[in-house]
Amino acid sequence: YSHKIQLCNTKKLLSVNIKMKGKLIVVALILLILYLLPSYPEPIVMRNFLSESERRHIISEATNKLETSTISHNKMVDENIRKSETAWLDKDDKVVRNVINRCLKHTDRPITNCEKLQVLKYKSGGHYKPHQDAFKGDDNMRVHTFIIALNDGYRGGETTFPNLNKSYKLNAGDVLFFDTLDNYNFITSKALHGGKPVE
């Protein structure tokens, strides 16, 4: 009789062990799936990234190069989508090169992979509807974006990430750093961002 009880208990233990193993396998699979899911880091704000003299130099160099901003590679002008002026500064400029090198310390990219410094001027009413900085089929896809505030003292102009429910207001000299792709280097809707109208 005691032997039979022992056998019954053994069967129960085996059943419990099988169930526990089953649960552990399920938990392991869930963790694996979560690990393999695409991830996207939140944008980072770095305060006082540029000095006042650097900001003044960049503004001075860009002033005579400003042109109406266009949309993407199409070179189209549509102020309903984007209203600003753009200038591009060469990396040969010592100040520009120093700023770019400082940015690159937060990435794994060499300066040869970096674009020229894009300077944007937003007047009252200037804005940029939510958009992506990376495009399908682009071999030279932008991987990281640094938005540097060259001045402040205005209302509006926050950088928003609608799919992250995040909004960032920068002071002069601050930089906003974010990835344009997910951890698998695919375009992600989480990187969608825009500039609110300047008042």
Regions found by a protein language model. Give the residues of each.
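Fe(II)/2-oxoglutarate oxygenase catalytic core
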Residues: 15-199
